[in-house]
């Protein structure tokens, strides 16, 4: 049976932590952590740093590439055991989970990992282990902090969210099977966040905390681990479509950037600014979302999101705005002449804003400075905005359909992971997804 933890090798035969059986929403064994045992985990990782530094780069890359390739194959033993509970825990359909894993893992396969390795240099020997506090909105994101951490030769503890505790230990276990010399340098665990007494030995024993989550949680970690925390907070994304762009071609890519992960990611498109015929684009986008709803069925809708989308639809009807006739779970497209950027309530919902003069957009987005992550750009006028969008804090621009598939070279939120993991003192905390 799957477990929500992977222990460093020196603790693998220990009687602690004990495990309890969880039945719903998925079946697995959950560890019962104490502060003493978590302290031992961090100590074991610190002692495993020397062995990690001795692994030849080509061996580390080979193990990583083979593990990622295995997890990209739905027919692999690892995926066949992991996919059913992972889909239930993440609230995604099997098809939606498959598409999401392809997007995330595709960016860290052997080729982009090798390119990142070529730029990596070892961290100082006394840098200490890294704690990566993972978010629960997307599956498999553990690989994004894990890869650069291993490439700079720092041991790592992946703290999984309680809502999805299975991917990280499963991936680490597969990686260790391919490169046993990693056994002392990696660990995964899940416990309720914010428990100060339980987390005290962990925060004290690590050198860096890479934390993904809400602002309140990041602020709390910074208070308890001052100077160690690199925070990745909530952000959102948008699209800009030039007047010369074929609406049908743009719509297909936009639909992917909206529907992937059921619109839960920081690179999920929440609004579209169109210089051309906004209604024509919205019509094509509705058709594309309906097609994706058949190929990537949405997961069960959360009640608050469902209520918010229904309210948005009613508001659009009262304002006589054009809106799609899609079933609510398939998506919602609304043409809104109010140019103010607003986040999406989710469930594949997007506003299309007609904006003939795209040069006005950066000023319209100014209130969102530092809270925007990505922009899907199509057309020359849209791409000319890239430098000004970057000034607002946007860290990724890509054609529609490619926004949610960054590779390992992406600086999430403008943060260079190799730099923050090798710097003697982390830079000021930045906000990203």
Task: Give the label of every model feature segment.
Residues 117-137, 191-203, 335-347:
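Donor nucleotide-activated moiety binding/catalytic core segment of transferases
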Residues 1-127:
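N-terminal Rossmann-like NAD(P)+-binding subdomain of aldehyde/semialdehyde dehydrogenases
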